[in-house]
Amino acid sequence: MRWPPWASDSQAQQQTAKHDEHDERQAAAKSTTTSKKKDWESSVTAIDWAAFTEARTIIPTLILTSGFLGAFYIHRRYLRRFPDAVSITPSYFRRRSLLGQVTSVGDGDNFRIYHTPGGRLAGWGWLPWKKIPTSKKELRDKTVHIRLAGIDAPELAHFGRPEQPFAREAHQWLTSYLLGRRVRAYIHRPDQYQRAVASVYVRRLLDFPPLRRRDVSYEMLKRGLATVYEAKIGAEFGGEAMERKYKKAEWWAKLRGVGLWKDYRRNKTKWESPREYKTRMGLEEAAQPPVETKK
């Protein structure tokens, strides 16, 4: 039907053709827009898998990954700090050592160290964030309790027990020999008192020859400041060769009558080793009647 009614057939055909042409242009424009949108989305989400197999991608990735894993391994194996003896992993027992600074000496055969893994090469003592604490408050729960392997020193007065002869001299010597110095402790095992039983070595400038590595347990035995560990259970020497060496050092100190062996020959019947002293104290305490508590 012509519209308007008075229009001729040719005019109606021209108008229809214009409308059709307009619709075609809109459809073409819409199709182009949709195609461009799809192309953009596909370009964004497309993954060029071939790029991941190129040398320029693989080599830096391998270097970065290896560096990260290597740094993690070195830190875990060599630079991890143990805050106490309980934290020491079994992989250290009879295999590895701890480097640290002695912060206190509790008795003639035990002391505490602040573990400094890596030593000065790792920045301990000179980097601002690797300073060794000095106050008791700062050191609380941050030191490893070390028990010297292979020896038994005279007992100081504690837990209500009297002081054993020559205990104070042994404690004073060990304090002057180790306090504030860096030592290396070869860990054998933990003991029942949450200490690490270890063979400990120190270097001192004033010793002769200077800076020679000294076995602390051996030095105490030579001076008659301790006896060879006599208990049958829990004895640690670091091997049979070290046990023979310690017994020989004790024999020489006894022969010369130095330290706690001074009155041994004249008073053998009353002379008491640290092991005998602890056994006697244990028997006396066991024989005492239990203390009744007031209700």
Swiss-Prot record:
It holds the Pfam family SNase. The active site is at R147, E155, R195. It is a single-pass membrane protein. Its EC number is 3.1.-.-. Coiled coil: none annotated. Residues 1-35 are annotated as: Disordered. It is found in: Mitochondrion; Membrane. PROSITE patterns: TNASE_3 (PS50830). GO terms for cellular component: membrane; mitochondrion. The chain crosses the membrane at residues 52-74. GO terms for molecular function: endonuclease activity; metal ion binding. Ca(2+) binds at D152. Its main location: mitochondrion. Residues 96-263 form the TNase-like domain. Residues 17-27 have a biased composition (Basic and acidic residues). Belongs to the LCL3 family. This is Probable endonuclease lcl3. The gene is lcl3.
